[in-house]
Regions:
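Short intrinsically disordered, low-complexity segments
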Residues: 18-19, 230
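Short, Lys/Arg-enriched N-terminal segments with co-localized hydrophobic residues
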Residues: 22-33
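Ala/Thr-enriched low-complexity intrinsically disordered regions
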Residues: 14-15, 35
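Catalytic cores of DNA base-excision repair glycosylases
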Residues: 34-253
Length: 253
């Protein structure tokens, strides 16, 4: 039994005698305070990371090439499991042949497949693009929807694509875009323990102010491409290193 002061939460409420415990029981309010404190520190670190990323990549923006929201939607669908660089090599010919939703909806499926073949999963992507454009015409008056729920009705569109289209097509920030770079970096930075993109997005939305949600994603993507790569990250060159638990852990190991 520990000797010394008896904490209030160690006492029997009826007799006032010390409970038979080997360590002090932490009251709920204390546990809650610790949790809040940890979250507050993580949020402060997230904001410092954002400041540094803004300094590193002040002009960062979406790297996909497009002229209209329909083209942005199509390019973002094509970017699934593919680099923006590869997509940008495909879209000039694609949009020259099929510049809008009507042209894409009426496109010959085999011709569409051939044009997007090099982006991977080309059959599914071509089918989704054609069907999505037909839905835009029939259901949304030929306009790419501005509502998250409506965008998610389109084939080939999950939250990542919807967030990109809303943010860069309409300036509407409703979520955090989570791609492979954002997932990798936020896990390494200790900002999330999840692997599911929706859960990662939820964690990040709690840490970063809403106006910066898309700025955060874009700059993490830039940093993931340039420094914090999937293999052989350049930690010795990283200006985020002293805020990164993965770097600190590797030094201990």
């Amino acid at each position: 039994m520990r000797q010394g002061q008896i904490y209030p939460w160690e006492q029997d409420v009826a007799t006032g005698k010390q409970l038979n415990i080997d360590r002090p029981l932490l009251p709920f309010s204390f546990l809650k305070m610790v949790t809040i404190r940890k979250f507050s520190l993580k949020r402060q670190r997230s904001l410092e990371l954002l400041i540094r990323l803004k300094g590193l990549y002040p002009d960062a923006t979406c790297t996909l090439t497009y002229q209209t929201t329909v083209q942005l939607l199509v390019a973002t669908i094509l970017s699934a499991q593919c680099t923006d660089e590869r997509v940008n090599k495909v879209t000039p010919a694609l949009f020259k042949k099929f510049p809008d939703a009507v042209a894409l909806a009426n496109a010959d499926i085999e011709e569409l497949e051939n044009l997007v073949r090099s982006t991977g999963f080309y059959r599914n992507k071509a089918k989704n693009i054609k069907t999505a454009c037909q839905m835009i015409i029939d259901k949304f008056n030929s306009q790419v929807p501005k509502q998250m729920a409506e965008l998610l009705q389109l084939p080939g569109v999950a939250r990542k694509t919807a967030n990109v289209v809303l943010a860069h097509g309409y300036g509407i920030i409703l979520g955090v875009t989570v791609d492979t770079h954002v997932k990798r970096l936020t896990q390494r930075l200790g900002l999330t323990e999840h692997s599911d993109p929706i859960k990662i997005e939820r964690d990040l939305m709690r840490l970063i102010p809403q106006p910066d949600w898309e700025n955060w994603s874009i700059r993490l993507i830039y940093h993931g491409r340039a420094v914090c790569k999937a293999r052989n990250p350049a930690c010795d060159q990283c200006l985020l290193a002293n805020l990164c638990p993965s770097v600190l852990q590797s030094k201990v190991d």
